């Protein structure tokens, strides 16, 4: 695995949603590095990728309330454990659970294993509220998928907050989730 600058030189065979991700980043003047790899479905499978990226690798979780009327995309450092009750209390929501794959595809054009903050570029009607754990913001860089799980990106955290999220029209809410005991 090798870290490359920017989009692939040859995008043939790549999915349109991946190419749209590169188009967005390029249009914003965001510098990024990319690594191509086998499908990474779990945080454990991302260990070797993490080493090459040298960035805060985030778990990106699509959550919803019991009625499936409120949806949240949570960015949390990979080493933290997600506790539903803690987050629910912080955001004043009823009990949260993982959203079904149908909502990932409908709102973010993403499938399980590929959930990424960059999928918010497809949420034109703002069905999903972005939640970012404050520890994500402490690193200079963070890693995420370009809406597919066979590549990973290394982006500046400042670019996420100052360029990417504003361009997608979402307002993040910062949360503070404790390390598991």
Where are these regions (language model features)?
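Extended, low-hydrophobicity, polar/charged segments
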Residues: 1-181
């Amino acid at each position: 695995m090798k870290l490359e600058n920017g989009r692939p030189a040859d995008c043939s065979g790549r999915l349109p949603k991946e190419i749209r991700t590169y188009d967005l980043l390029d249009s914003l003047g965001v510098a990024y590095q990319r690594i191509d790899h086998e499908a990474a479905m779990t945080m454990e499978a991302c260990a070797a990728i993490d080493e090459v990226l040298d960035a805060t690798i985030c778990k990106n979780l699509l959550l919803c309330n019991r009625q499936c009327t409120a949806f949240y995309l949570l960015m949390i450092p990979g080493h933290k454990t997600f506790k539903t009750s803690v987050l629910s209390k912080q955001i004043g929501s009823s009990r949260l659970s993982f959203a079904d794959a149908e909502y990932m595809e409908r709102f973010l054009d993403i499938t399980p294993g590929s959930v990424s903050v960059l999928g918010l570029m497809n949420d034109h009607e703002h069905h999903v509220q972005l939640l970012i754990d404050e520890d994500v913001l402490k690193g200079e860089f963070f890693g995420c998928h370009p809406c597919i799980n066979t590549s990973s990106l290394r982006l500046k955290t400042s670019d996420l907050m100052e360029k990417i999220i504003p361009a997608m029209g979402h307002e993040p809410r910062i949360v503070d989730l404790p390390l598991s005991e």
